Regions:
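Cysteine/selenocysteine-centered motifs that mediate thiol-based redox chemistry or coordinate metal-sulfur cofactors
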Residues: 18-21, 111-137
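Glycine-rich, small/acidic residue-mixed loop/short-helix segments
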Residues: 105
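CN hydrolase (nitrilase-like) catalytic-core segments centered on the catalytic cysteine
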Residues: 1, 10-101
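Active-site mouth loops of central-metabolism enzymes
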Residues: 4-6
Length: 137
């Protein structure tokens, strides 16, 4: 099963967890992640990479994250698309700023099952302990 996330969804762990609990083995992310001129480009890139690896690790899923490159008005999009495995390992990536490229990786979906069995991420959850996560802000 493939789950889809759009851009900013990546910043919210609940979205990825919900898809994983529904049986997703692979999360596909399409994003326009970048930074404004006054923002630190290194920080924006670090956030992007951290979110991808965190969603893969915390849910024991593959994440294929595609990010836009180029400029629009004053906003800069840096690319850095990547495929990450259920243990957070990078399977493939496209260097920053590369235009119109693609990455290919062979994904063993059995690795998702094995990782989940080993780490017990879903079984050890304690939903009553964090009911506030589903309350409106």
């Amino acid at each position: 099963y493939i789950g889809g996330l759009l851009g900013w969804d990546l910043a919210f762990p609940e979205a990825a967890r919900s898809l994983a609990l529904d049986g997703a083995d692979l999360l596909c992310v399409c994003a326009n992640w970048g930074h404004a001129p006054a923002q630190d480009p290194g920080l924006a890139l670090a956030e992007w990479q951290t979110y991808i690896h965190a969603r893969a690790l915390e849910n024991a899923v593959f994440v294929a994250a595609s990010n836009r490159v180029g400029e629009e008005y004053s906003y800069h999009f840096f690319g850095d698309s990547r495929i990450v495995g259920p243990r957070g390992e990078t399977y493939a990536f496209i260097e920053e700023e590369v235009q119109e490229a693609y990455a290919i990786a062979t994904l063993d979906l059995d690795a998702v099952r094995k990782t989940r069995e080993e780490l017990q991420l879903m079984q050890c959850r304690m939903p009553p302990a964090y009911r506030s996560l589903v309350r409106r802000y």
